[in-house]
């Protein structure tokens, strides 16, 4: 591997390790939280509504229990990182969306990969 290319990859890894994005750090503390972040942000950018149940179904079954997955979502919602909305057409459906601050910080996080 060329030295310049290697140094570029090392710089990316350094910035990923040393960023100060508080909300992203919260989701990086646990694999389940990180997967939830990626699913919620993908849905947000695709302008899709993801129910809590669909998010749980999207998570690998072997990384955590359903209770842990729900606890992760509840914790993120309580902190205001994720917003829980009830469907207007079906009150049983609950959607999870990122907060504006999370969208901004996630955008900064993605720039670390692209710059």
Spans of features found by a protein language model:
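Short alpha-helical segments that sit at the start of domains
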Residues: 10-40
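Amphipathic alpha-helical dimerization/coiled-coil segments
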Residues: 12, 20, 107-115
